């Protein structure tokens, strides 16, 4: 834990930490959505292979399914949320650093 010179610096640091944690949480959810898409695609390929159909047919069928669209939409949503939270955290870290340097001057 860093040493703080004033309460504003500490508040900025704590806000940055909280935003960073939310960003990581969103990233984990995005990874779960991507894994759901991948596992669904593989399952569809196995099912089609068992029936003697091609992987291309399985991919076409999978891409049209609601579960695939939801997984892709969830991935995109959570990735954008993670990006937003990480950018906000970076701004708060910069603010804390600025406040620290301003106190030293």
Residue ranges: model-predicted function:
Residues 29-64:
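Extended alpha-helical coiled-coil "stalk/arm" regions
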Residues 26, 64-99:
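Amphipathic alpha-helical coiled-coil segments
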Residues 2, 42, 48, 72-73:
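Arg/Lys-rich, low-complexity, intrinsically disordered basic segments
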Residues 11, 18, 40, 60-67, ...:
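Alpha-helical oligomerization interfaces
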Residues 32, 39, 46, 84, ...:
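Heptad-repeat coiled-coil alpha-helices
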